């Protein structure tokens, strides 16, 4: 895959528009940088003066730990990531005092996964 400046710009601007992204978001990476959202969201967060939090390895425990520590507002993840978060033990799931917005790509997550995530503010 070849990335180009025009594509990176369009991806960044499109994400700002489609996510109604505010200034200074706090974004938690759960996807590899070589994925479209992985590379594109680096530019998006820079555009919006955001904070980027990276995970070396994904696990629901690490996700929820870092999400709470850094007060994340946004994250991106494949449906399998969302399923892992929805299926995590209740004891590690925080109740966020704000909605954490997620962007996914590939096949849409099942409705049951989206419902489970919504219970915890995701």
Model-based region annotation:
Residues 25, 31, 100:
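Nucleotide donor/acceptor-binding cores
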Residues 5, 9-26, 34-73, 88:
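Conserved AMP-binding/adenylation subdomain of ANL enzymes
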Residues 59, 80-82, 109:
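Alpha-helix capping/helix-boundary segments
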Residues 32, 78:
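Conserved proline-anchored active-site loop of SAM-dependent methyltransferases
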Residues 29-30, 54-55, 103-105:
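Thr-Gly-centered strand-to-loop micro-motif
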Residues 11, 29, 41, 62-63, ...:
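Hydrophobic alpha-helical segments typical of transmembrane helices
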Residues 1:
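Conserved adenylation A10 loop of the ANL superfamily
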Residues 47, 69-77, 86-122:
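Gly/Ser/Thr-rich phosphate-binding loop
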């Amino acid at each position: 895959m070849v990335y180009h400046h025009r594509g990176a710009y369009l991806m960044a601007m499109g994400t700002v528009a489609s996510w109604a992204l505010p200034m200074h978001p706090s974004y938690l990476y759960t996807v590899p940088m070589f994925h479209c959202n992985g590379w594109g969201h680096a530019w998006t967060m820079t555009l919006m003066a955001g904070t980027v939090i990276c995970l070396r390895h994904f696990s629901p425990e690490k996700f929820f730990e870092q999400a709470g520590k850094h007060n994340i507002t946004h994250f991106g993840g494949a449906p399998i990531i969302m399923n892992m978060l929805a299926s995590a033990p209740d004891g590690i799931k925080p109740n966020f005092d704000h909605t954490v917005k997620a962007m996914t790509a590939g096949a849409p997550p099942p409705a049951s996964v989206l419902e489970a995530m919504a219970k915890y503010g995701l």
